[in-house]
C-alpha cells in the first residue's frame, strides 16, 4: 500500500520538476523563483503559519499584470499533471498488485461462488446485463482536446517508466519525451478562443470512442468472460452485447439554439463516416491475420472456392467500407455522392454476417485460437458500436412541443391548445394519434421555432429504426407532454414508434412521476404502441438545485421505487435513465457505490446513465481506465441483481421523510427566501464572469434575464465550487441531520449509516464535499468582493457549514474527515497547496476586473479564465 502511493508521489514530483524546467526555459528563472516562493508560502499557510499566509496574500496582491498569467498557468498545469498521475495510479501495475479490488468482477464472482449462488442464476443475470452510457457534451468541460491528447501521451510514458527492465538510455528517452509533452502543453493555450460548436462537441465524443472505448469494450468483455469461465464454467455468447453507447452531442437541443435539425443530420453522417473508418482499420488488420486456407464446406458453398477463403470475404468488406467512407465524405461536404447507396454498408448485418461465418468456420476447423483473437474483437465491436458508432438521443423541452401543437390548433380553428385542461389535451392527442388522416395542413407556414421542432422530427423520420435511441422530454410534467411528442413524430412521418422518455427534474415532478406514468399506462393507444417497455429519466441536477441534495436524493429514490412497483404491477419492462453528473450536487458518486445505493429491483433491466464532459475523460478517456470503469459498473449491476440491497425499514423511511422535509425547507429558506441571496451569490462567486468562458456550445442560462431559477444547474454548481463554499452539495443536509439527532434519533441514523447503502453513500459523499470546502477562502472572497452589508449571509452559511461538519464527524465517530479513506484525504491536502494560490489569485483578478468593468485588461481576463480552469482541476470535478 505504501509503495503504491509512494510511486504516485514520485510521479507527481517528477512531473512537477519537468514543469519547473519548462517554465524556467520559457519564462526565465525569476518567474520560476516567484512561483516556487508562492508554493512554499501556500504549503506553510496550510500548516497554520499566519506569517506565511500574510506573505502569500501580499505576494499575490502585488503581482504585475504581465506576471499573473504565467503564475496562474503554473499552478493550473501542475494540478492537471497531478490528475494525470492519479488517473494513471488506478491502472498501474502497483495498484493491481497491491489492491485486489473487492469491487472488481472477479472479486464479485468469487463472492457469488462462496455464497453458493446457482450457476444458472449467474448465467441468466450476465446474459441480461446491459450498461448504456450516454456521452454528453459538458458545459464545464474545461480541458481542450489538444491538451487531452498530450495528457494521454504523458500517461503512456508513465506506464513505460513502470517497467523494471529499462536501460538507462531507455529511461532517459522516456523522460525526454515527458519533458517534450509538458513543454508542448505549456506552450499551448489552455483556454479556447471561442466556444465549440455542437458539431465540434460531437467530434470530441467520437474521439473518445476512437482513442479509448474501441479498444476497451472487447478488452472488458475478455475480462468478463475469463471470470465467468474461472468461477462458473461458462463462456459469454459471441453475440452478447452488454455495453452500448449513445450520445447527446448533436441531439440535445434543450436550451441550445445551436443544435438544429441540420446539425443533427450532419452529426449522424459523421458518426457513420467514423464507424466506417474504424471498421476499415480492423478489416485491414484481419486481412493480414486471416491468411489461413482451411474452411468448412458450408463456408465454401456460400462464398466460393478460393485459396485464401477468409481473405476473399474480408477484402470484399474492405471495398464496401472504402466506398462507405467516400459516400459520407461527399454528404458531409454537401456534395452529391459519387457512390450509389446500394454499394455501401448501411446496416450492422452487412458486417456481422460474413465475419460471423468466418468465426464459425474457424471454430469448426480447429482454429479457435485464431477465431477468438482480433476477429472476435471485431464481432463484439459490431454488436456494441455498429455502423452508426453510437446511437443518438434527441432532447427538447416540453413547452416547445406544447407551443408547436398550440400553433396548429389555432391555425385549424380549434382554439389554443395551451389553454386547455390536461384531460382535454389528452383527449385531443389520443384522437389524433388514432386517426389515419394527417393533422398538419399542407399550406400552413409555422413559426421558426415550431418549424425547427418539426424539422427535427423529420430528421428522425429519415433514419432507420434504432439509429435514434429515444426522444427525451426535459421538464416533463404531465401525460400530455409525452403524447404530444408521439403526435409530432407521427405527423412528421416517423414510420415506427420511437421510445419517448419523460425526464422528471424538479422535486414536485419527481413526486408526481408515478401518477403521470400511471395515467399513460391506462391509455389503450399508449399501451398498444410501447410494446410493454418504458424508459423514464430521473433528473439529478435540477432537483438538487430546486430542493437541495438531501431532499432531492430521497425524492429520486422514492420516484424510482414507485415507478419500479408500478411497472411490475402493469407487466411493463422499466428502464431507469439516470441523468447524473460528476459533482455531488448533480447526483455524482463513485459509480459502484452509487449503483448499489439504488432501490431494489431498479437495475434488473440494466443501467442507462449520462457520462459528462470531464467525467468522460476521467472515467473513460484511457482504454485501461475505461476497462476498469466498465468493470465497476458491471460488478455493481450484477451484485445489485444477484445480492440485492435491503428494502428500507419503515423507521428509516420515516427518518428520511423528516430529513427531506427539514433539509428542503432550510435550503429554500436561503436560496429562495433570503432577499440578499442572489446579489450575494453573484458577488461572492465568479458566476457572471463564467459566462465569458468559452466552455460549451450551450448558453449558461435558459433565460438570460432571469435569476438563480433561470441559471442552469451546471453553472450554478460550478460557481459555488470556485469559491470553495460548495453550497449546493451540502446546504440543508447537515442541519437536518443535526435536528434529527437532537430529537433522539442518532441510534437509528447510525444504523442507517451502517446497513443501508443508499444512506451511507449520501453521508460518504457529504464527507467528501466537506473535505473540499474551505471556510477561510470563502471568507476571503466575501471580504474582497462582496458589499459589507451582505457579509452576514456568508458568515451565517460558513457557521452552518462548520456545524454540519461536526454533525457528520459525530456520526462517523472520527476526529478528521475522510479518516476511513486516508488516500483521498492526502490527495486533497496535496492539491490544496496548489489550488489555494489559484483561489487567492482569482479573488485579486475579480477585484481588478470589477473595479474597471468597462475597460477590462486582457491579461487579467485571460488569467481569470486560467484560475477558473485550474480550480476546477484542483477540485477534480467541475459542474
Swiss-Prot record:
**Active-site residues from the entry:** 138, 545
Matching InterPro entries, A to Z? PEP_COase, PEP_COase_bac/pln-type, PEP_COase_Lys_AS, PEPCASE_His_AS, Pyrv/PenolPyrv_kinase-like_dom
A Pfam family of this chain: PEPcase
Record keywords: Carbon dioxide fixation, Lyase, Magnesium
Q: Name one GO molecular function term.
A: magnesium ion binding
> Which biological process terms from the Gene Ontology are attached to this UniProt entry?
carbon fixation; oxaloacetate metabolic process; tricarboxylic acid cycle
EC assignment? 4.1.1.31
Q: Name one GO cellular component term.
A: cytosol
Q: Which PROSITE patterns match?
A: PEPCASE_1, PEPCASE_2
From the UniProt record, list the reaction(s) this protein catalyses. Answer: oxaloacetate + phosphate = phosphoenolpyruvate + hydrogencarbonate
Q: Needs which cofactor?
A: Mg(2+)
> What are the annotated disulfide bridges?
none
Top-level taxon of origin: Bacteria
PANTHER family per the UniProt record, alphabetical? PHOSPHOENOLPYRUVATE CARBOXYLASE
- State the protein's purpose: Forms oxaloacetate, a four-carbon dicarboxylic acid source for the tricarboxylic acid cycle.
Similarity comment text for this entry: Belongs to the PEPCase type 1 family.
Query: What name has this protein been given in UniProt?
Result: Phosphoenolpyruvate carboxylase
Q: Which organism is it from?
A: Pasteurella multocida (strain Pm70)
Amino acid at each position: 500500500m505504501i509503495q503504491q502511493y509512494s510511486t504516485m508521489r514520485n510521479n507527481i514530483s517528477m512531473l512537477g520538476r519537468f514543469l519547473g524546467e519548462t517554465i524556467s526555459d520559457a519564462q526565465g528563472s525569476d518567474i520560476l523563483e516567484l512561483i516556487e516562493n508562492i508554493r512554499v508560502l501556500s504549503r506553510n499557510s496550510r500548516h497554520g503559519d499566519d506569517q506565511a499566509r500574510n506573505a502569500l496574500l501580499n505576494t499575490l496582491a502585488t503581482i504585475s499584470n504581465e506576471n499573473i498569467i504565467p503564475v496562474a498557468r503554473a499552478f493550473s498545469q501542475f494540478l492537471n499533471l497531478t490528475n494525470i498521475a492519479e488517473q494513471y495510479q488506478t491502472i498501474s501495475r502497483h495498484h493491481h498488485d497491491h489492491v485486489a479490488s473487492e469491487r472488481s468482477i472477479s472479486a464479485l464472482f468469487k463472492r457469488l461462488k462462496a455464497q453458493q449462488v446457482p450457476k444458472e442464476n449467474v448465467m441468466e443475470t450476465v446474459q441480461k446485463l446491459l450498461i448504456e452510457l450516454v456521452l454528453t457534451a459538458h458545459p464545464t468541460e474545461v480541458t481542450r482536446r489538444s491538451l487531452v491528447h498530450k495528457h494521454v501521451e504523458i500517461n503512456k510514458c508513465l506506464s513505460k517508466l513502470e517497467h523494471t527492465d529499462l536501460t538507462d538510455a531507455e529511461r532517459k528517452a522516456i523522460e525526454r519525451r515527458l519533458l517534450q509533452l509538458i513543454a508542448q502543453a505549456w506552450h499551448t493555450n489552455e483556454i479556447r478562443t471561442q466556444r465549440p460548436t455542437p458539431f465540434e462537441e460531437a467530434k470530441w465524443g467520437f474521439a473518445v470512442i476512437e482513442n479509448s472505448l474501441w479498444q476497451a469494450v472487447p478488452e472488458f468483455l475478455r475480462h468478463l468472460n475469463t471470470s465467468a469461465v474461472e468461477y462458473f464454467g461458462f463462456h459469454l455468447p459471441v453475440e452478447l452485447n452488454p455495453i452500448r453507447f449513445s450520445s447527446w452531442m448533436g441531439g440535445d437541443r434543450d436550451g441550445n439554439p445551436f443544435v438544429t435539425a441540420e446539425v443533427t443530420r450532419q452529426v449522424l453522417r459523421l458518426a457513420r463516416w467514423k464507424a466506417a473508418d474504424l471498421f476499415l482499420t480492423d478489416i485491414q488488420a484481419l486481412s493480414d491475420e486471416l491468411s489461413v486456407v482451411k474452411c468448412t464446406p458450408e463456408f465454401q458453398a456460400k462464398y466460393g472456392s478460393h485459396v485464401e477463403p477468409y481473405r476473399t470475404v474480408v477484402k470484399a468488406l474492405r471495398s464496401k467500407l472504402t466506398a462507405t467512407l467516400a459516400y459520407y465524405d461527399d454528404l458531409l461536404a454537401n456534395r452529391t455522392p459519387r457512390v450509389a447507396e446500394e454499394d455501401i454498408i448501411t446496416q450492422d448485418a452487412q458486417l456481422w454476417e460474413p465475419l460471423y461465418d468466418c468465426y464459425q468456420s474457424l471454430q469448426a476447423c480447429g482454429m479457435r485460437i485464431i477465431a477468438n483473437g482480433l476477429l472476435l474483437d471485431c464481432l463484439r465491436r459490431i454488436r456494441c458500436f455498429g455502423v452508426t458508432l453510437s446511437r443518438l438521443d434527441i432532447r427538447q423541452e416540453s413547452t416547445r412541443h406544447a407551443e408547436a401543437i398550440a400553433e396548429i390548433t389555432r391555425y385549424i380553428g380549434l382554439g389554443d391548445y395551451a389553454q386547455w385542461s390536461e384531460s382535454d389535451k389528452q383527449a385531443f392527442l389520443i384522437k389524433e394519434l388514432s386517426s389515419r388522416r394527417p393533422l398538419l395542413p399542407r399550406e400552413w407556414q409555422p413559426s421558426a421555432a415550431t418549424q425547427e421542432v418539426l424539422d427535427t422530427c423529420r430528421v428522425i423520420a429519415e433514419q432507420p429504426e434504432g439509429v435514434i435511441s429515444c426522444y427525451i422530454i426535459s421538464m416533463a410534467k404531465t401525460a400530455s407532454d409525452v403524447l404530444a411528442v408521439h403526435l409530432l413524430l407521427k405527423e412528421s412521418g416517423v414510420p415506427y414508434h420511437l421510445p419517448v422518455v419523460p425526464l422528471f427534474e424538479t422535486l414536485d415532478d419527481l413526486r408526481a412521476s408515478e401518477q403521470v406514468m400511471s395515467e399513460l399506462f391506462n391509455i389503450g393507444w399508449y399501451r398498444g404502441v410501447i410494446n410493454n417497455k418504458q424508459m423514464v429519466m430521473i433528473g439529478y441536477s435540477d432537483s438538487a438545485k430546486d430542493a437541495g441534495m438531501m431532499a432531492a436524493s430521497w425524492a429520486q429514490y422514492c420516484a424510482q421505487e414507485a415507478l419500479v412497483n408500478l411497472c411490475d404491477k402493469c407487466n411493463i419492462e422499466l428502464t431507469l435513465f439516470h441523468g447524473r453528473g460528476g459533482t455531488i450536487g448533480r447526483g455524482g458518486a463513485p459509480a459502484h457505490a452509487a449503483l448499489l445505493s439504488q432501490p431494489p429491483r431498479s437495475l434488473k433491466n440494466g443501467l442507462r446513465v449520462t457520462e459528462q464532459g470531464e467525467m468522460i475523460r476521467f472515467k473513460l478517456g484511457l482504454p485501461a481506465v475505461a476497462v476498469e470503469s466498465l468493470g465497476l459498473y458491471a460488478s455493481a449491476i450484477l451484485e445489485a441483481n444477484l445480492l440485492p440491497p435491503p428494502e428500507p425499514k419503515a423507521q428509516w423511511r420515516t427518518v428520511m421523510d423528516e430529513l427531506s422535509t427539514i433539509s428542503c425547507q432550510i435550503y429554500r429558506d436561503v436560496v429562495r427566501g433570503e432577499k440578499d441571496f442572489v446579489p450575494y451569490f453573484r458577488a461572492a462567486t465568479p458566476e457572471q464572469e463564467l459566462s465569458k468562458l468559452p466552455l460549451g456550445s450551450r448558453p449558461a442560462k435558459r433565460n438570460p434575464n432571469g435569476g438563480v431559477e433561470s441559471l442552469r444547474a451546471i453553472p450554478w454548481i460550478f460557481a459555488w465550487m470556485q469559491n470553495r463554499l460548495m453550497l449546493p452539495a451540502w446546504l440543508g443536509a447537515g442541519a437536518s441531520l443535526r435536528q434529527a439527532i437532537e430529537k433522539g434519533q442518532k441510534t437509528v441514523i447510525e444504523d442507517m449509516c451502517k446497513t443501508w447503502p443508499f444512506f451511507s453513500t449520501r453521508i460518504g459523499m457529504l464527507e467528501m464535499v466537506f473535505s473540499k470546502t474551505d471556510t477561510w477562502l470563502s471568507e476571503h472572497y466575501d471580504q474582497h468582493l462582496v458589499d459589507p452589508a451582505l457579509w452576514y449571509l456568508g458568515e451565517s452559511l460558513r457557521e452552518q457549514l462548520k456545524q454540519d461538519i461536526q454533525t457528520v464527524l459525530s456520526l462517523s465517530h472520527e476526529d478528521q474527515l475522510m479518516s476511513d479513506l486516508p488516500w483521498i484525504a492526502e490527495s486533497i491536502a496535496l492539491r490544496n497547496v496548489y489550488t489555494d494560490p489559484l483561489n487567492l489569485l482569482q479573488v485579486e483578478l475579480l477585484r481588478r476586473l470589477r473595479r474597471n468593468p468597462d475597460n477590462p485588461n486582457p491579461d487579467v481576463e485571460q488569467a481569470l479564465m486560467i484560475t477558473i480552469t485550474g480550480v476546477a482541476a484542483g477540485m477534480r470535478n467541475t459542474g
